[in-house]
Amino acid sequence: MQVIEGGINAAGKKFAIIVSRFNHFMVESLLDGAVQTLKHYGEVADDDITVVRVPGAYEMPVTAKRLASSGKYDAIIAVGAVIRGGTPHFEFVAGECNSGLGRVATEFDLPVAFGVITTDTLEQAIERSGSKAGNKGSEAALSALEMVNVLKQL
């Protein structure tokens, strides 16, 4: 039986991180978690990380598509926060962000890690951006590191 697993060292690989400005007070913590994880665990150099800031989560898929089509990156990481409000807006934004990023991953055969927190409350979002429930930006970066190495073996 053959088992394929990916390590997390990705020295020399290039990563793009798409960062939503909406809910920036917690999203910056997600970005910091992603960058620190890439550098510390993946041994990725500063020059191999590109940060692209966009207005919100809805703009992430088209940005990811442009980054993927450039051929410059080994993986893309999306970090942001969408918090439920009193209207259906949450479902539209979160759903389009999730499905759009997934389409980019499959269309371009490229890891696109989802570090966009989608929560019912502000407190839940804060917990997932570096306090009680860990840092989803860091977790997304670990996923990207591993998937770069898994796909390299396939």
Swiss-Prot record:
InterPro entries, per the entry: LS (IPR034964), LS/RS (IPR002180), LS/RS_sf (IPR036467)
Keyword Transferase: yes
Binding site for 5-amino-6-(D-ribitylamino)uracil: 22, 57-59, 81-83, 114
Keywords, sorted A to Z: Riboflavin biosynthesis, Transferase
Annotated GO biological process: riboflavin biosynthetic process
GO cellular component, one term: riboflavin synthase complex
Keyword Transferase set for record: yes
Enzyme class: transferase
Role of this protein: Catalyzes the formation of 6,7-dimethyl-8-ribityllumazine by condensation of 5-amino-6-(D-ribitylamino)uracil with 3,4-dihydroxy-2-butanone 4-phosphate. This is the penultimate step in the biosynthesis of riboflavin.
Subunit structure: Forms an icosahedral capsid composed of 60 subunits, arranged as a dodecamer of pentamers.
Protein name in the entry: 6,7-dimethyl-8-ribityllumazine synthase
Provenance organism: Idiomarina loihiensis (strain ATCC BAA-735 / DSM 15497 / L2-TR)
